[in-house]
């Protein structure tokens, strides 16, 4: 994704080499996931890693102020305490976002997607293994709400909040303007859905 300056690319390096046909992960013992900032001319600005080597940096969202948030998928022991969401605020290091242990356990070592709502200063993260979507205040890192949605995956910011899709063909609009986040179903054309979401 491009940073707000239009000159810097932010890259999530998952660190996993996958065999093309079988999709088998080939290098779990030598993973080096990272968050990279790269200038348009190819100059490396920064390369930062989280402490857990098997924590694959997979998904990114960038706020208008240059805050970068990443979602991880942990390939190690299911009982390990890996940071599944991380944040890089302008001028600061790439570091774990404070989830809370109950949230981390609900995620079951896997995030699918995330999005930032710049006007409302909210972060939305989907966790399909935990059948949950989470909404945080981006500035205070306070959890606003957790909502049950089976196999939720895609998420995108819209005027009033977020749209979230699922691998089961469900789609919800979450209105985040009030104190409580309200959800309403959205109708999708038959057969036109996916685990990823981009709104135009």
Predicted features along the sequence, with ranges:
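Residue position within the beta-strands of beta-propeller blades
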Residues: 11, 69-71, 125, 164-165
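Surface loop/turn motifs at the tips and blade-to-blade linkers of beta-strand repeat domains
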Residues: 48-53, 98-108, 145-150, 185-188
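Beta-propeller blade signature
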Residues: 25-42, 82-91
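Short, conserved, GDST-rich strand-edge loop motifs in beta-rich repeat architectures
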Residues: 11-31, 71-82
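Short loop/turn segments that connect beta-strands within beta-propeller blades
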Residues: 39-42, 89-92, 138-141, 176-178
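Beta-rich catalytic cores
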Residues: 31, 55-58, 81, 110, ...
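Short coil/turn segments that connect the beta-strands within blades of beta-propeller domains
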Residues: 7, 65-67, 119-121, 159-161
């Amino acid at each position: 994704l491009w940073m707000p300056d239009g000159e810097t690319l932010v890259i999530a390096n998952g660190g996993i080499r996958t065999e093309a046909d079988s999709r088998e992960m080939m290098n779990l013992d030598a993973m080096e996931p990272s968050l990279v900032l790269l200038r348009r001319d190819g100059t490396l600005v920064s390369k930062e890693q989280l402490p857990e080597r098997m924590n694959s940096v997979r998904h990114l969202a960038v706020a208008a102020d240059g805050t970068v948030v990443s979602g991880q998928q942990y390939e190690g022991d299911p009982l390990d305490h890996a940071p599944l969401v991380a944040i890089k605020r302008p001028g600061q290091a790439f570091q774990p976002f404070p989830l809370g242990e109950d949230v981390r356990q609900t995620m079951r070592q896997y995030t699918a997607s995330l999005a930032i709502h710049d006007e409302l200063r909210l972060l939305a993260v989907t966790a399909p293994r935990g059948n949950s979507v989470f909404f945080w205040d981006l500035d205070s890192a306070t959890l606003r709400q957790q909502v049950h949605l089976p196999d939720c995956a895609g998420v995108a910011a819209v005027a009033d909040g977020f749209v979230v899709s699922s691998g089961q063909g469900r789609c919800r609009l979450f209105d985040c303007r009030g104190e409580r986040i309200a959800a309403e179903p959205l109708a999708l054309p038959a057969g036109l859905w996916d685990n990823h979401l981009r709104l135009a």
